[in-house]
Amino acid sequence: MCHNSVRSGNKAGFLGIKFGSALLSIATGAIAIALLCKFHDHEAVLIVIVCSTLLYGIPSLISFITETVFAPSKFHIGYFYNVLNFALPLITMGCTVDYFHNTLRSPISVQSESHRVYITTLDSLLIFTLFINGIQLGFFLKDGNANNFGSSSNNISTDQYDKEANAVENGRFVPLKNSSQTLTPDLELLHGSPKSMNGVAWLINELSTNSNTNANKTISSDENSNSSVIRHKLGPISTSKCPKKPSHSHFSKLKKYNSFFLGPKENRYKRNTQQATKVPTEKKSNHRSSQYVSRLSTISDISKSFLNFLALNEKNGNSTSTARTPSEGRVSIIINEGNNTLKYKTPHDSHTIDSPNLELEREAIGRINSALLPACLRVTDKMISPQQSTQNEDSYQATPLIPQVEVDDDFYVGDILMTNELQDIPQVPRISSDIEDDFEQQYTKHVDLPARVTLEMWEKDQEKILQKVTTNRDKSKLLPPFRFTSESDMDPSTSTELEVELHAQNNFSFPFKSAGLQIATSDQFNQQEFKTSDTISELDEYLHDPSIQEEDASQLIESSLNQNNLSSTTIDNGPKDMSRFSTRHSPTKSIISMISGSGSVKHQHSHSTLSNFFTGHSRNNSQINQLLQGSSSNMMSNTSPHSSPTKSLRMRFGKKLSLSNISDTMSPYEGSTTDPINYSFGHGHNKNQSIDFSYVRTLQSSHSPTKSTSGNSRRDSLNNDRTQSTVNERALRTASTLFYLQHNNATCTLNGEEPVLDTPQSIQSSSSGSEQESAGSGSGYPEVVFSEYDREKWNVLRNLKEIAPEKTIESGPVEELVSPSK
């Protein structure tokens, strides 16, 4: 159960006690089973003793074998085994007390000698089992909780107690840092524990001894400069012994036993935390600097005073400080290898060093954005040949990161980055004094020199380098300011390169119009209309068209959006003598196009004018013949140009603005104030008069040449196959049920109380040899033909001979009016 406590205590003794307890429990259970089988049939105390001893002995034996043979960390029984180890010995003890109490109160009658041996053996095993189990249980409660389960909780409590004690002793404060310490967190260890910083303590001692020995000398402010921030002395973080706790705090000891019943997940978590705390601190100290690699600690930002003190100390020949420099691990990137001689190494040579810290530092410097550095300081990954590297090695001159104090000629403070095997910074050589003034006046900005320019290269190819810089600068990579046109479109005599002026194209217009609209001839305009991409462009073109001048733009928009001007729409479209388009069409689309497309109102007319127009208008026989005959001589009549381009624009403009529903105010009944039913639908219009849709169909087909051509090409095939496609046309039309009713649906009633509407008299179509009356203007309609859509369908069926014109409605049901499809 308690593997960690067993390893920390007397492992051999504890395992012996555990093994003996397991064997005694199993033996006690076996003797109790023998007594139950032979002599005591039904004794409850013995049954409970058998169960408790076997349940306790078998898992204990398994745990012992696991700890001795297998790896203890690979096998864990867990929470249930802890409960058994604690509860089963108590159950066994209770049953043993009850067993001895019953034996003393009523002695057991011995039946045979073997019976006596069983009883004696059972009594002895019970006593020894209770004794050994008590010892093992004591080990569990003492060592197990204190060392294993309570270890992590004790560590947490002691750490918290240490923090509280230090806070009470030193007082609460907010520690402040220098700006250099925030950038180099390694220096924080100077004020930390002396045990972990034995190699760095020489810095503080050197500062104090130098100020004491040289008291009579005048010390510069750089050498003896101290921080202006008050530093609070902090005690060591790691303590060797735990503080004493009050003796009366017994409640904390009771909390330890709660961890005895933890499950396997909690035990695994505590084992991991305990193993993590046992990692030796020596290995961690060797890689102390790796945790600061991702920060700015790789870039030195130490104050000038600290660096100058180190330089002067090295000048005076004080080697004791460097002797005590830590040999393992870097405390700071500056305090390391102070007495090494200056070595100039190229970046190519620095890659041969196998130090992991230097590799990490080099990667950290490489992560700096190269856009923030000048060209001579940018890190390049180009490989340098050995000959070129040896040739340029003498020409490099290291640049110190921080300016140093002027000293004698025999002393030189090495570069900080060179000392720590970092990237060298080559210095760009200065230009000779004779041309320095002229060069600075001509090139005031940054000079884009090559990445690596040595002194020897500069002496050899000085003119070539400067020429390359001038050519790169003369090439303008950006367009001049506010230049929207190319140089070829501009007049060189009127504009200069540095002139800040807006130059617009001569043919610029907004919105954009294609050049084809301006240069198209009259013949091309009659054959094809150029369509714009969207409604907004169409609206702009319509409102700014110079050909439309007879009306105001606001009036045009208002009249186009008006959906109730049926009279003006019909009058504008009615007198046009246009042939009907022969292909199938949608009457609903025709009416919508008529209403919304050509709704330009010039003069308002009354309903009487509309009724007079209906009465006097008719179509001749030639129009019907053109519909039924597919002669090629009549093809060009459908593709005739518009008589008025203004109406075409108005129609397309209104069609793009909206598509409204049909507001049918026409009625097949005559207006009569006496008949309330007919008057509600009639509105005073004449009966049996249809609207001529020929002009609307012509507008729909003629504004698109592709549509007109395709329609004319299909005319012959459609007319020839008219008889075979009557069934399909009948199925496609939505109002077919109005013309194909059953026998009992010859009449319709509005409701149960209204009188049945009588079917009208049959209207015979009068025809002559030269002229036949139009089926749409002078024919009679049944009562089921209610709307304009139904009238148009009725006319089509009449023209196609699908409805017998001579038959009357009263002679039979409506089913007889329709000739059967062949």
From Swiss-Prot:
Biological classification of the source: Eukaryota, Fungi, Dikarya, Ascomycota, Saccharomycotina
Keywords, in A-Z order: Membrane, Phosphoprotein, Transmembrane, Transmembrane helix
Record-given protein name: Uncharacterized protein IRC8
Membrane topology of the entry: Multi-pass membrane protein
Ranges for region Disordered: 271-290, 698-728, 751-783
Extracellular side, ranges: 35-44, 98-120
Entry's transmembrane regions: 14-34, 45-65, 77-97, 121-141
Low complexity composition bias: residue spans: 761-776
Composition skew (Polar residues), residue ranges: 698-712
Gene name as annotated: IRC8
